[in-house]
Amino acid sequence: MTYIDTLGQQAKVASRQIAKLSTAAKNDLLNQVAKALVAESDYIITENAKDMANASENGISKIMQDRLLLTEDRIAGIAEGVRQVADLQDPIGQVVRGYTNLDGLKIVQKRVPMGVIAMIFESRPNVSIDAFSLAFKTNNAIILRGGRDAINSNKALVTVARKALKNAGITADAVQFVEDTSHEVAEELMVATKYVDLLIPRGGARLIQTVKEKAKVPVIETGVGNCHIYVDKYANLDMATQIVINAKTQRPSVCNAAESLVVHADIVEEFLPNLEKAILKIQSVEFRADERALKLMEKAVPASPEDFATEFLDYIMSVKVVDSLDEAINWINTYTTSHSEAIVTQDISRAEQFQDDVDAAAVYVNASTRFTDGFVFGLGAEIGISTQKMHARGPMGLEALTSTKFYINGQGQIRE
């Protein structure tokens, strides 16, 4: 029996045990986990410091180190997120529909747990607890495989959760942690059809592509965000400037940060020079521009074709000039990762056309792409942002981690 077989078998057994937990029992456990995270902050920070030291030694960028860092405030924020999940309405057992058919059968469709969820993710250690809390709230067991960069932080966080489960008399195997960060073990998890009911990868383009190519278990893709801001010819340019600055610079290392700027030719001469001046007062951003934009920006560099398809996760932004709304939409649909896209315009009909025609999970009018988030959307914590057109699209909250089951009651009916 392999390492993943052992974890998978334990998770499968645990999933059957926790499937019967009541809402009250689940909420009480989540609140206990939240308390334990705060109480164990020193331990978690000590383990996180090991990852931070390794990151510094390995030359990981400051932006990526910030994703990795855990402080008392950030741990308190993670704990608050767990409490918020406890406060969310429990979807398990909810009736999706119910009716009596022509044969007199009473048919009810209810939400039920998936069973065992596996998650492969990178860098951000808070994901481990976010994922556990959502899985547990929906009566699912979860297997977590984090990245090498955050191995000590993730292990510490999961250790705290497992201890809280044990103290509550609930099987600690409701959350499993894969300590082996090798690609071989990750790929074994991707094909563990005997145990895993759903796999959610959360990370960069390379991880997502590897999972798409090698997984044999059901997968929901998340994450990669080549997000665009299109500044229309009817845009309020002051508003557009603030939206671009926020979407690019507030937190560039996350998947809902803007990576590409598309500007209508009619306003480009006024907008781009002013945007460049405004943004550089706040943050040094490297603009990689097409030929027309390059002539209007003092510090821009020429863009390569690859730049328009890149999720930079850094203070870098590609710039494209277009001659029409249709061209903007076609351009975005060519390069989008179907995450979050935005238009800035005062023309309602053009805004509606953009929202209808752009193929993305979240399409904004006159707002930053940075709002694509489970809490902001009122879904609570998210396990990821789905860029597929499956049952789950956009921020994945509790309902995305459920399946449905038909309950049929009869009185001796047979089919003629």
Curated annotation (Swiss-Prot):
The keyword rRNA-binding does not apply. This is Gamma-glutamyl phosphate reductase. Pfam families: Aldedh. GO terms for biological process: L-proline biosynthetic process. The lineage of its organism: Bacteria, Bacillati, Bacillota, Bacilli, Lactobacillales. It catalyses: L-glutamate 5-semialdehyde + phosphate + NADP(+) = L-glutamyl 5-phosphate + NADPH + H(+). Pathway: Amino-acid biosynthesis; L-proline biosynthesis; L-glutamate 5-semialdehyde from L-glutamate: step 2/2. Catalyzes the NADPH-dependent reduction of L-glutamate 5-phosphate into L-glutamate 5-semialdehyde and phosphate. The product spontaneously undergoes cyclization to form 1-pyrroline-5-carboxylate. PROSITE patterns: PROA (PS01223). Keywords: Amino-acid biosynthesis, Cytoplasm, NADP, Oxidoreductase, Proline biosynthesis. Belongs to the gamma-glutamyl phosphate reductase family. GO terms for cellular component: cytoplasm. It comes from the Bacteria. Gene3D superfamilies: Aldehyde Dehydrogenase, Chain A, domain 1 (3.40.605.10), Aldehyde Dehydrogenase, Chain A, domain 2 (3.40.309.10). GO terms for molecular function: glutamate-5-semialdehyde dehydrogenase activity; NADP binding. Its EC number is 1.2.1.41. InterPro entries: Ald_DH/histidinol_DH, Ald_DH_C, Ald_DH_N, Aldehyde_DH_dom, G-glutamylP_reductase_CS, Glu-5-SA_DH, GPR_dom. It is found in: Cytoplasm. It comes from Streptococcus thermophilus (strain ATCC BAA-250 / LMG 18311).
